[in-house]
């Protein structure tokens, strides 16, 4: 019998299926059958969140899991949270890892056009969304967040002071800035693009994602094809030469602007890179134990966080070319703005 399409059917009394779902349910178990977060084990997922999980005591386990699986956990503090409270939470939870992105609970509004209402949601959903649309060398800093119509603070007419943004940038957290404070245009954007690590060489989101991307590459099927092959102590051993050629070739592709999606004429890594796979790191004693070692070093592209313009003007100014480059010691702690 054909369905009746002439009149709309109104559904009522349904549920969203979240009855009985707790933070413990979201965390799950790491035994077979794996459940919750642990269902992601060996799934090659790039980033994940556990929707609206609020148990601070779980954060350390989440960070450890993300590190072990080469993933990045993306979470936000409770709705309406303050910067100082979020900073305290990060410290009390023992969060100091590149594999955890912690966003302030200045929750985001988005317009549900189908139902004609604005909905308030955890900002981690926009964190997941933006990194899912960026190649791993890109940082979400100052990237337009499509779909965000407001945040709790912007609705109340509250902007972030320079002091507050400095705390965000140096405290291992992030937040969503309103359009009037995004440096590149009139849109909502993330303020720091930093993970929860205190290591300044590793606290950018691009560090986490590029590192995870390259680690997964090193564990790819192409690299795995060397398992079971033979290796000799001869200087011209083909197994080692082919392993080096594989990683040299891949590095060359990463450095190519074409592979970097043509962004600003850049690739995904900087040059030069280094690949070592010879007798210097594969002596006979290690070969006898079944090991093949390859040392791979790459330099990531650096994110522009501070655009500093040194200006002098006036009718009595003598124009000279400055040949002395600035030193990092000259600069105070900036906050990701063009100045």
Identify the function of each model-found stretch.
Residues 55, 282, 301-305:
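Generic "edge-of-domain/loop-turn" microfeature
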